[in-house]
Curated annotation (Swiss-Prot):
This is ATP-dependent Clp protease ATP-binding subunit ClpX. CDD domains: RecA-like_ClpX. InterPro entries: AAA+_ATPase, ATP-dep_Clp_protease_ClpX, ATPase_AAA_core, Clp_ATPase_C, Clp_protease_ATP-bd_su_ClpX, ClpX_bact, P-loop_NTPase, Znf_CppX_C4. One of its GO terms (biological process) is proteolysis involved in protein catabolic process. ATP-dependent specificity component of the Clp protease. It directs the protease to specific substrates. Can perform chaperone functions in the absence of ClpP. Belongs to the ClpX chaperone family. Residues 4-57 form the ClpX-type ZB domain. ATP binds at P121, T122, G123, S124, G125, K126, T127, L128. SUPFAM superfamilies: Glucocorticoid receptor-like (DNA-binding domain), P-loop containing nucleoside triphosphate hydrolases.
């Protein structure tokens, strides 16, 4: 291999066979049989190949678009329950990508963009549904928190930063980013602070809704390359957001009261008021299914913003039975994840049925939905995961109801069939 020094024996100056530069003009010269190539030409060839791959890959990705049934089946593998929401999402996502695939409208009919609004309590699976869809379609996915966004010119995150994050996920490939999915969480937190427009500017509420309007509907956003700060001399990447699918989600706490007032159900005041008991709590989810655009306006979203989210799907609160299923049934269920961790140590991990029910019951009492399951399982297994790498001969660990309740430690079974509780104090 040559480098940027003279050829030792002959003192002959070497040149790149492609660009003609001498070994003194380049960093490295690679030698072949009577041929030399410099590092600059190698890099140029790499760039040409990368560009060709970029041109081919979008076509290859879009060859086969999964049907709504196939999308739903993929969601079923990872998300428990929420059947209605899965169906709504599958159809909306299928129609969106069908619109992109058939970009040239027939008979002058231009297909409108159908962004999605997900309404459901914390831990009901809103984020997981969006993530799973993106994975199923093999498209870039990014998440944004609406509470961190502010209008341009104010302290906080600019809405265009959302597109920047999406570009980062696909290595600043604009074509790929334009086929991506953006999930904006906590969208209910940017509702207007009061029904009446105020003289003081609401930069984190209505102001953010206004800023998001064009982005969600479709505009060409100018984004600085590689995350640089904007300055006049810089060339921007032009991203067409009309091709990006936006999914907005929020808990919308108290929205059911707005719906009930409209429907004149349970709106009594004083001694004659209807009070919901424990058994009637499930009706809140049922009430949310009756949501109309006017209810969302009253809640604090501006009409123009609601108009950009024509597809609305409501998610129900997960019950104890659903949480038990979430722990064990999906492809990436928590019990399967922790079993895989234990397998790396050569140990089998077993969760008994009563343990799963106890974990689900604890999560229900914390009112965190499926989101709280991981922290419970982590705390149960902490001492065991701490001890096992230092203990020889362990083949199995068993978790039962008493472990979840904190009454005992997980049982360790050794090679010689000896059962012993982990002390957790080693």
């Amino acid at each position: 291999m040559g480098d940027n020094k003279n050829n030792g024996d002959s003192g002959k100056l070497l040149y790149c066979s492609f660009c003609g530069k001498s070994q003194h003009e380049v960093r490295k010269l690679i030698a072949g049989p009577s041929v030399y190539v410099c590092d600059e030409c190698v890099e140029l060839c790499n760039d040409i190949i990368r560009e060709e791959i970029k041109e081919i890959s979008p076509k290859r990705d879009s060859d086969k678009l999964p049907t709504p049934h196939e999308l739903r089946a993929h969601l079923d593998d990872y998300v428990i329950g929420q059947d209605r929401a899965k169906k709504v999402l599958s159809v909306a996502v299928y129609n969106h990508y069908k619109r992109l695939k058939n970009a040239s409208p027939k008979d002058g009919i231009e297909l409108g963009k159908s962004n999605i609004l997900l309404i459901g309590p914390t831990g009901s699976g809103k984020t997981l549904l969006a993530e799973t869809l993106a994975r199923s379609l093999n498209v870039p996915f990014t998440m944004a928190d609406a509470t961190t966004l502010t209008e341009a010119g104010y302290v906080g995150e600019d809405v265009e930063n959302i597109i920047q994050k999406l570009l980062q996920k696909c290595d600043y490939d604009v074509e790929k980013a334009q086929r991506g999915i953006v999930y904006i969480d906590e969208i209910d937190k940017i509702s207007r602070k009061s029904d009446n427009p105020s003289i003081t500017r609401d930069v984190s509420g209505e102001g953010v809704q206004q800023a998001l309007l064009k982005l969600i509907e479709g505009t060409v956003a100018a984004v600085p390359p590689q995350g640089g700060r904007k300055h006049p001399q810089q060339e921007f990447l032009q991203v067409d957001t009309s091709k990006i699918l936006f999914i907005c989600g929020g808990a919308f706490a108290g929205l059911e009261k707005v719906i009930e007032q409209r429907a004149h159900v349970g709106s009594g005041i004083g001694f004659g008021a209807q009070v919901k008991g424990e058994k009637e709590k499930a009706t809140i989810s049922e009430t949310l299914t009756q949501v109309e655009p006017g209810d969302l306006v009253k809640y604090g979203l501006i009409p123009e913003f609601i108009g950009r989210l024509p597809v609305v799907a409501t998610l129900t609160e997960l019950d104890e039975e659903a949480l038990v299923q979430i722990l064990s049934q999906p492809k990436n269920a928590l019990t399967k994840q922790y079993s895989a961790l234990f397998e790396m140590e050569g140990v089998e991990l077993e969760f008994r049925e009563d343990a799963l029910k106890a974990i689900a019951h604890k999560a229900m009492s914390r009112k965190t939905g499926a989101r709280g399951l991981r922290s419970i399982v982590e705390s149960i297994l902490l001492d065991t995961m701490y001890d096992i790498p230092s203990v020889d001969g362990v083949v199995k660990a068993v978790v039962d109801e008493s472990v979840v309740k904190g009454e005992s430690a997980p049982i360790l079974i050794y090679e010689h069939n000896e059962a012993q509780a982990v002390s957790g104090e080693q």
